């Protein structure tokens, strides 16, 4: 494999973009601080309580708040894409040897990698402060389940970045982030919603991300329905992302 192959170019661009993202300390703090603080607050209130289905309330909250922080990190990477489009960097890349598909894959990889601080720190707080007790295998399985379940949100960040402008991408990202988090049951149990809202919640990818993580952390295996729904969202958003990317290239 030479340094000019699409795979090598994708990896190199993803590495450079990830380094730039991790240098943005403000971005990292904002995507980690709120979910971590909320988890610590609620974990102290509900310590020792049982959520049912082999799950403690603290473990339930740990998955919810980790998902909350990770979704925010993934979606908000769209802001950098919008900035790159405004300054002309995106257009320069289109004229380079980097294929469009490699660019999109690299950006999706970056979106996935910037979610790791929120995931790791909330899980670490769960183990140390929250008293969540899992085997090494359970920690690994739960972490991987939540992380891989974030793929549609990484793609959603790309969609927002290519469809929005520098002026609109931040409010769009925030509304989408909070809307998916609340409606998906990351802040409040979906069971507490009115019946019609419960049905709407089950259409959101955030609901199934939380369901995936909670089912795995409870030791009940991987829920097939959650995987299928998240995969479906990934395919739909991927198609929209490709369309938005191509459309953004036609604008001066």
Descriptions of predicted regions:
Residues 51-52, 132-133, 184-237, 251:
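Membrane-interfacial helix-loop-helix junctions in multi-pass membrane proteins
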Residues 12, 16-20, 91-95, 161, ...:
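Short amphipathic alpha-helical coupling elements at transmembrane boundaries
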Residues 41-46, 163-203:
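Transmembrane helix segments
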Residues 100-175, 221-231, 236-239:
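Alpha-helical transmembrane segments and their short interhelical loops
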Residues 80-112:
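Helix-loop-helix units of permease transmembrane domains in multi-pass membrane transporters
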Residues 43-48, 127, 131, 158-162, ...:
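Transmembrane helix-loop junction
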Residues 1-14, 196-206:
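Short, membrane-interfacial amphipathic segments enriched in basic
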């Amino acid at each position: 494999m030479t340094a000019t192959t699409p795979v090598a170019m994708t990896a190199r661009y993803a590495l450079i973009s990830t380094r730039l993202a991790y240098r943005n300390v403000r971005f990292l703090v904002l995507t980690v601080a709120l979910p971590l603080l909320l988890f610590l607050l609620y974990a102290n209130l509900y310590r020792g309580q049982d959520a049912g289905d082999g799950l403690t309330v603290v473990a339930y909250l740990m998955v919810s708040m980790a998902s909350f922080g990770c979704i925010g990190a993934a979606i908000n990477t769209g802001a950098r894409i919008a900035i790159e489009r405004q300054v002309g960097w995106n257009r320069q890349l289109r004229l380079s040897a980097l294929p469009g598909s490699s660019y999109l894959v690299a950006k999706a990889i970056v979106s996935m990698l910037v979610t790791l601080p929120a995931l790791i720190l909330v899980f670490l707080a769960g183990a140390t402060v929250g008293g969540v007790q899992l085997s090494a295998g359970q920690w690994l399985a739960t972490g991987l389940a939540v992380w891989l379940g974030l793929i549609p949100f990484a793609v959603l960040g790309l969609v927002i970045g290519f469809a929005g402008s520098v002026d609109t991408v931040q409010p769009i990202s925030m509304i989408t982030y909070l809307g998916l988090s609340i409606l998906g049951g990351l802040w409040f149990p979906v069971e507490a919603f009115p019946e019609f809202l419960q049905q709407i919640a089950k259409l959101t990818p955030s609901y199934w991300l939380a369901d995936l993580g909670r089912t795995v952390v409870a030791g009940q295996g991987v829920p097939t329905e959650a995987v299928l729904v998240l995969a479906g969202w990934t395919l739909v958003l991927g198609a929209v992302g490709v369309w938005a990317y191509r459309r953004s290239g036609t604008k001066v």
